[in-house]
């Protein structure tokens, strides 16, 4: 069983560094997708700190995708971008664990027993409500 940690990267280098260091012992592959435009279609330059990736080079699967999809609405564009994660998990087996989250949503895998998770799909959503 392998664990894939998959994210869409949008320039959060300091948070990415924390994530990579925190999950390094538990994760087999880090799949990082970066686009040449934002979810809203604004063109942007590559922002990843390649020096940061060197320490984790044997685990990193980094893809910079510079394609013009600005003709579609932001929700479809975000969906298209998230679907590009498939590039980094093509060799995944049915027993592998694939985590997809935002860069700043860092799971604590050290306390979990993932060996008995089985063939199930788990979805976790975190919502913070501000009660007055």
Which residues make up each language-model segment?
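Conserved beta-strand scaffold positions in the cores of enzyme catalytic domains, especially
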Residues: 30, 62-64, 121-123
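N-proximal low-complexity "stem/linker" segments adjacent to membrane-targeting elements
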Residues: 1-25
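Short His-Asn-centered micro-motif
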Residues: 5-11, 33-34, 100-103, 124-126
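Short loop->beta transition adjacent to catalytic acidic/histidine clusters or analogous donor-positioning motifs
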Residues: 2-4, 24-38, 57-61
């Amino acid at each position: 069983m392998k664990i894939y940690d998959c994210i869409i990267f949008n320039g959060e280098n300091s948070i990415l560094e924390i994530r990579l260091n925190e999950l390094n012992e538990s994760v087999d592959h880090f799949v990082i997708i970066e686009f040449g435009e934002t979810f809203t279609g604004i063109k942007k330059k590559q922002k990843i700190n390649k020096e940061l990736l060197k320490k984790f080079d044997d685990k990193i699967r980094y893809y910079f995708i510079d394609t013009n999809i600005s003709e579609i609405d932001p929700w479809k564009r975000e969906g298209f971008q998230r679907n590009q994660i498939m590039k980094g998990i093509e060799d995944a087996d049915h027993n592998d664990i694939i985590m997809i989250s935002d860069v700043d949503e860092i799971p604590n895998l050290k306390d979990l027993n993932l060996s008995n998770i089985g063939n199930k799909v788990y979805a976790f959503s975190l919502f913070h409500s501000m009660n007055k």
